[in-house]
From Swiss-Prot:
One of its GO terms (biological process) is mitochondrial translation. Keywords: Mitochondrion, Ribonucleoprotein, Ribosomal protein. GO terms for cellular component: mitochondrial large ribosomal subunit. One of its GO terms (molecular function) is rRNA binding. This is Large ribosomal subunit protein uL16m. It comes from Acanthamoeba castellanii (Amoeba). It comes from the Eukaryota.
Length: 141
């Protein structure tokens, strides 16, 4: 067997997990809901970001798909085992940071994240890193 067949994920609640912080960059895109984020949705939002910000080495992806979803073919009767692996997903929970950005102009970043969040299946918000020296509160738009 090439891929492990996992059980289906059941999301218990839609509470936003506030303790997921920005570690590497200055800004981040935080999810506000639960979903299975597919690799196609992730690449579509990445293309939308890179279309606006033409810089390299500015983006850190924290949500990489690792979970295989299985599907049975059409017109197949019930039973006879689990289906074959079809789609790779990332089980995204509310409050998790999807992308982190560093050394990027703030106005360009907001425009890029607005276009990329339209391609994601969950509502999102932009968060800023907490600075201990100036004691600034983490801001969000």
């Amino acid at each position: 067997m090439r891929f492990k067949k996992y059980f289906k994920i059941k999301y218990k609640n839609n509470n936003v997990y506030e303790h997921d912080l920005i570690h590497f960059g200055d800004f981040g895109l935080k999810s506000l809901g639960n979903c299975n984020l597919t690799s196609e949705q992730l690449t579509a939002s990445l293309k939308a970001i890179k279309r606006v910000i033409k810089k390299k080495n500015f983006l850190i992806i924290k949500a990489l798909p690792f979970w295989m979803l299985t599907r049975k073919p059409r017109d197949v009767r019930m039973g006879r085992g689990k289906g074959s692996p079809a789609v790779k997903v990332y089980p995204l929970k509310a409050g998790k940071i999807i992308f982190e950005f560093k050394n990027v102009n703030e106005t360009l970043l907001l425009r890029a994240l607005k276009s990329s969040s339209l391609r994601l299946p969950v509502p999102t918000k932009v968060v800023k890193k907490y600075d201990k020296r100036t004691d600034c509160i983490k801001s969000s738009w």
